[in-house]
């Protein structure tokens, strides 16, 4: 499996670099937000310590188990898979902060690649990571500023809506064109796959609205 993974990395090195840059950017956003709250509240505990790192490993393991148990959905082409790995990621984020959440999401994808490799030239893996972060980061930031049950609920609802809007737009603007280019598959062919499932799909916008958005809503609920 490792040889296949290294071969995939060599074949898609530019895209892999883009993935790493995006991951670093999300980590820095989470770190800056958490650092602000730590200073504001006078919290002396470090953002990352031995206990947190151990718990990040535990939640990452739970997340990757749920991630590899993904399954296709009837309203989208078969390369779209639904999983519930955001549950342990969200719990870890609420418990230990947004930096821990981003690290859980990253470790989940890294472990999955080591176990199963990639079947989408890393496009699906980037999508899962970035869209997952678009859910847990808003949710955790809303909760972080005032840790109450109502804020947690508001955070989850807001995170779901943001993930749905962002995930839909990210698919249309970047992920689907990247998938099309990496696999040499015309974008129209991908849209046609959606049209076979749902007659309402007539173009890229209707594809992401009818095939991608419902899946992101399900992930958040």
Regions found by a protein language model. Give the residues of each.
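Loop-helix junctions at membrane interfaces
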Residues: 1-221
